[in-house]
Curated annotation (Swiss-Prot):
Cystine crosslinks: C63-C91, C107-C446, C465-C479, C467-C477, C769-C775
Originating gene: sqv-6
SMART domains documented for this protein: WSC
Species of origin: Caenorhabditis briggsae
Record-linked InterPro entries: Glyco_trans_14, WSC_carb-bd, XYLT
Protein name (database record): Xylosyltransferase sqv-6
Amino acid sequence: MVVVGGVNTNYRHYALVIVLFFFLNVYLLYSAQNSVQIRKDEGETREKFQTPKVPLVDPISTCEIVDELAKSAISRATSPGCKSKLQLEACQLKNGTFSESFPQSTCSNHQDALIDQRIGCFLDKKDARVLKEFEYKFPQSNSKSTCRKNCYKAGFLYYGLEFGLECFCGNDVANATEIDSGECRNYKCPGAEDEFCGGFNAVEIFRTDKLVMLKPKYLPPAENVSKPPIKILFLLQLNGRNERQVKRFLKSIYLPNHYYYIHVDKRQNYMYSEMAKIAEKVPNIHITSTRYSTIWGGASLLQMFQQVIRDSMEIEMFKDWDYIFNFSESDFPILPIQDFERLITEHQGKSFLASHGYNTGKFIQKQGFEFVFSECDQRMFRIGKREFPENLRIDGGSDWVGIHRDLAEYSISNEELPQKLRKTFESILLPLESFYHTLAFNSKFCDDLMMSNLRLTNWLRKQGCRCASLKQIVDWCGCSPLVFREDTKIKFEMQKAISKPTYFARKFDSMVDIEAIESAEQQSMSTSKIQMDHPTYHFAYANIFKFGIDEEKIAHRSLASFALNTIKSHEKMAKIVQIDALRAHHNAQIEIVMKVETQSGANFEFLIHRKSHVNLSTSGALEVDGYVLKDVVYGTKFEWKEEICREYMGFVTEKDTLHTRLEWSPTERVKKNDKTSPEIEFQYRNGPEKIDKSIVKPYDSVFGGQFDSWDVGKRLSNLSTCPDFFVDVFSPSSSESPLATLRFSVYTEQNVDCHVAYLRDFFEIVDFCTSETACGEKIWSMSYPDPKSDIQVGWDEEARILR
């Protein structure tokens, strides 16, 4: 060992290295801090409307999950990221760190001095309630604080305590009979032992702190509006593949002085590609590339809406809008767009929100506000119950809104209330139905509301509240409106629309009933702009397949080859270019239009007709328990609400669920409030061999429908042969002969050799064309003009319409 000056040289080397590392760390820290500061300075101008950063989910559990809702949700999540997100949020909920505390309301309808102000003790009976609007029961937690909080959030003026556990809410005590105060001191509050919660048939009533219920009066527009014109941002939230109906809607609402902003669901690439073509032709139409999967009930819908607000303010040509109104692909105007424009101008500064139309307390329950939902794996999972803060007023109604610029800017700002509400509404079902209502009612904007969104919705809850279609995407049951048909379009007749007034209506679907759209169009547009005598005026189209966007299915390829062989063409198919469904009239059968490119580069277009293989009993025995069987249809992608199959080509594969629909007509022997169909037995067979059966109970349908669903893949295996499958429909009381029999085929990649025989039985090539010129003369062709929806040039100033 060498020692110099009493110091080991090895230690001197170590010390030198340590010193060098120290200065290196100091330099790196300085550089990082400087970089952060530079980025901060660059971002200051965008800070106000910047999209909030999404925090990373901690994958580590912080607690033991005991809530059954949370345990169920985590077990059903498919991705690790979703399971981790649900686990963390369930722990936050359990630990009390999930909810926010909110600032005091700045609405003029709120006064602190009224909080818990005692009104008195009143006689109360089950059949003669003082506070009639809503009732809660809190066996463990009832108290003044608990009751007030729940009545406050529903917007009521008064809350009342009774029988220990009962909490009542209402807005009127004018006709109440006051009794001795001692009658209201018979039961201790289970949630506060030093308080009393009323007596037997005795309710003690207090104020929440609301002054009056705000009900802005609707003012009809004057004929001449002296106020400066407004600019509206029309937000089109699009889904599906019926782009021709969207174009028709756009033509009906387009004015060059407004803005049109298009968001297409992230999963709908065909619609996106078609809308992008329009945006290229018309300068004040913009399609955003920032796309969300807007599932039913999901938080993503509100996030998308607010992202559009942020982004539109940064687009130079679009940034000066005054209002944002959102619409879907199934909306249509029922009064002239100029009248709508005039009314909005008359009420500048007001936002247009539709109320739920009934008791707020019931609305809160039906909307699932009391539960926490979490969106991941394209599903809304329910993970537990929530506690809302005492001072938050909740309200809601429709998610089709008209928001003034001031409220829109406030909603995306970093002020405390909107910032905390955005966070809270990430875990609320259908957030756009209540976010802006709640934000306005708890802020200075509560006086700037018109409680109407100027829309008419075709509600029929008996039919629209079918939960079957929602089971795959949400842990809840919700309602959707129905499509307008011949018997319901009277709802939007001119005088009814004016009296509300309502300027738009929904839902419309050209593949269900195009005549309803025609009625709305003729009512809202000048007839000089509508070519009612055009051959395709009654035609409805919906795209099924587009090359470069969709994956080709084996059954589609088989049909294309079959079509070429049927016309005795020697050409070989190279690719399917496009497939559309065509309905020539609202009562017509849906046909298939297929465009095929051959290996030589030639294009063929085919009109293809589907053959039905349904046999109804010829013995006349079609009546069961007073119901007469009228028709039997089958298909896949069944829509329970409208009772139609959205797989228009009629193919059934081993991956599908087969849906068989019976249509019944009641005789005079059926009582008025009975179901619309009898009990029926379905039997499934492979040739003569019975393979399954099911009993279907009586059903209640406004269309007289009754259904059975049969999972093909789970019931059948080894589908490499060419069997014929049958569904027999029997009356349970008579199984000797079926009421009806339908035949269907199952197309797989393993039984391709069977496809030609199947196609020969189930399809007919009705017509075809082989050139652009020839196809342009076929009214069924994709190339034939369709002026009601074509947008090929842009704005025609002279005709004042998109062409």
